[in-house]
Design a protein with these regions (language model features):
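Short beta-strand and adjacent tight-turn residues that come in two discontinuous sequence segments
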Residues: 49, 68-69, 86
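Short, well-ordered secondary-structure micro-motifs
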Residues: 32-34, 57, 95-99, 159
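Short, well-ordered beta-strand segments
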Residues: 19-21, 67, 84
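An extracytoplasmic/periplasmic, membrane-proximal ligand-sensing/linker region
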Residues: 39-42, 126-187
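A local structural motif
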Residues: 16-19, 38-50, 54-65, 152-158, ...
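Short helices/loops that flank or line small-molecule/ion binding pockets
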Residues: 34-39, 53-67, 72-80, 169
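C-terminal lobe and pocket-closing loops
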Residues: 72-140, 170
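Hinge/capping helix and adjacent helix->loop/strand transition within the periplasmic-binding protein
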Residues: 1-54, 101, 114-147
Length: 187
């Protein structure tokens, strides 16, 4: 496939024939691909793999048609796999010619691999704010930025611990809804 629209057109013309790799059944890639299918109006078959490298090898070998993967794989397997879209809300600086999913015509909520820092419940709000400020400062150090770029990561901090809690709630809500609709979790 040369583009997301080609992939979607193929899937719609050949119902049930598109297969896509997932890192474990019910993982983030599986849930996001299920959400994308619902929004774009096609249905494919999830093929589970033990991890990203196995899935990339499945794409290269033609065992699967596509797979949602972290950016490091696009960078590592350059020339062997074709990135079709960035799932985030903006193009990725390391692959500037690859459009976002929205630019490709699928208006799915943006997605990214993300993580966060947590502290014990009941942590003094002043201490939480100080930790957040320290993380913001460290995240701008040139050595930290260089390390993240070298491993195909971007760092975007929320502005406050409260915003991070809201992100957690939002992510859990869509994952629960998609997982339940796909029969991956009990309703």
């Amino acid at each position: 496939f040369q583009s997301v629209s080609e992939l979607v057109d193929h899937a719609k013309r050949n119902p049930g024939k598109l297969n896509f790799g997932v890192i474990g059944v019910g993982g983030i890639e599986h849930l996001k691909m299920s959400q994308i299918q619902r929004i774009a109006g096609f249905k494919g078959l999830a093929i589970p793999y033990k991890g990203g490298p196995d899935g990339v090898n499945g794409v290269i070998a033609g065992e699967i048609d596509c797979m949602l993967l972290p950016g490091i794989f696009a960078k590592t397997f350059a020339g062997k796999v074709r990135p079709l879209a960035i799932l985030g809300d903006q193009r990725w600086q390391q692959l500037p010619s690859v459009p976002t999913l929205a630019e490709s015509g699928i208006q799915a909520p943006p997605a990214s691999y993300w993580g966060g820092w947590s502290a014990p419940a009941g942590l003094n709000p002043k201490t939480a704010s100080e930790l957040a400020a320290l993380l913001a400062k460290v995240s701008q150090r040139p050595d930290v930025v260089a390390t993240l770029n070298a491993t195909a990561h971007e760092l975007r901090l929320t502005e406050s611990p409260g915003q991070f809690r809201q992100k957690l709630r939002s992510e859990l809500a869509w994952m629960t809804e998609v997982g339940a609709s796909e029969g991956l979790i009990a309703k």
